[in-house]
Regions:
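Positively charged, low-complexity terminal tracts
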Residues: 1-133
Length: 133
């Protein structure tokens, strides 16, 4: 019998991890940014849930990044937003509450990775997209 979920880890430049979890009984992909230390302890989670269409947009943004253009990827069930900015060969990733966008504050957690690491993240997103039915 296959596992009820699949997870993958993407290690970033600042010792943070983008952690992806797909559960077969849910119609979305969970995305979390946490420190590698928190990953071992399973604490410090900042979570956002993305539907398939949003994951497709995120994958396309990573594979063909528009320079200095902000990508907003909204959670479909809460007010969380995943924000990605590509600038000077780096991708900067934040998770925050939608209301914080108006206030220009309230970032819950953030990380970054280089353009040369992007193909690995694209591979992970493609694997996760294949799990959606």
């Amino acid at each position: 019998m296959a596992a009820d979920y699949r997870d993958e880890k993407f290690y970033c430049q600042d010792n943070n991890v983008l952690y992806f979890v797909f559960r077969k009984d849910e119609p979305w992909l969970g995305v979390t940014i946490l420190s590698s230390k928190a990953l071992k302890k399973r604490e410090g989670w900042e979570h956002i849930l993305l539907r398939k269409e949003t994951v497709l947009r995120l994958r396309d943004y990573i594979s063909h990044p528009p320079y200095n253009e902000i990508g907003y990827f909204e959670c479909n069930c809460t007010s969380e937003i995943l924000r990605v900015v590509y600038e000077d060969n780096f991708f900067y990733v934040d998770i925050f509450d939608n209301s914080a966008l108006k206030l220009k504050s309230g970032i819950k957690t953030s990380t970054y990775f280089t353009e040369r690491d992007a193909p690995e993240l694209e591979r992970i997103l493609n694997n996760m997209l294949n799990l959606f039915e």
